[in-house]
């Protein structure tokens, strides 16, 4: 099924598909990554928690997937993220006014090790409609705080 979807998307876009993020962050290790490798996917953005914030891979820089069963480092680059906006809102019940209190410590940890802060935001989050009112400002504040010129 995945091969069929990647092939179809490639035809529609007239280009190779090399990046992936699993919907709902559904990740079965190592099978999901092996399937992506078989489809020539080079980068995956699924590595993160759905129900909490933090560093699921204990690292904030991209790394190549190491297959423990085969004892091989693969060419699949994993790009871990530290937080998802839906986790703050739905799982942690954080409102927009308090969201930066949760996000800033993550960014501070990343800056300490000169890493890369990656977060996951959905496009409808930034529309400022009733259900997501205030979250666009959180996103803007997060980007500003994470900028290299901020300490």
Where would I find each of the regions flagged by the language model?
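C-terminal domain-boundary segment and adjacent tail
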Residues: 10, 97-151
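Generic recognition of short, well-ordered alpha-helical segments
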Residues: 4, 31-34, 130-137
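Active-site-adjacent pocket scaffolds in enzyme catalytic domains
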Residues: 1, 7-110
């Amino acid at each position: 099924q995945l091969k069929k979807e990647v092939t179809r998307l490639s035809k529609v876009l007239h280009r190779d598909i090399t990046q992936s993020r699993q919907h709902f962050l559904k990740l079965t290790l190592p099978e999901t990554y092996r399937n992506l490798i078989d489809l020539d996917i080079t980068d995956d953005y699924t590595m993160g928690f759905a129900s909490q914030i933090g560093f699921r891979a204990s690292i904030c820089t991209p790394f190549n997937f190491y297959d423990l069963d085969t004892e091989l480092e693969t060419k699949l680059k994993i790009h871990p993220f530290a937080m998802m906006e839906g986790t703050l809102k739905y799982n942690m019940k954080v409102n927009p006014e308090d969201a930066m209190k949760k996000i800033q410590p993550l960014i501070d940890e990343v800056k300490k090790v000169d890493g890369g802060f990656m977060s996951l935001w959905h496009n409808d989050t930034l529309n400022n409609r009733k259900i997501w009112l205030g979250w666009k400002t959180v996103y803007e504040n997060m980007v500003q705080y994470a900028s290299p010129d901020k300490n």
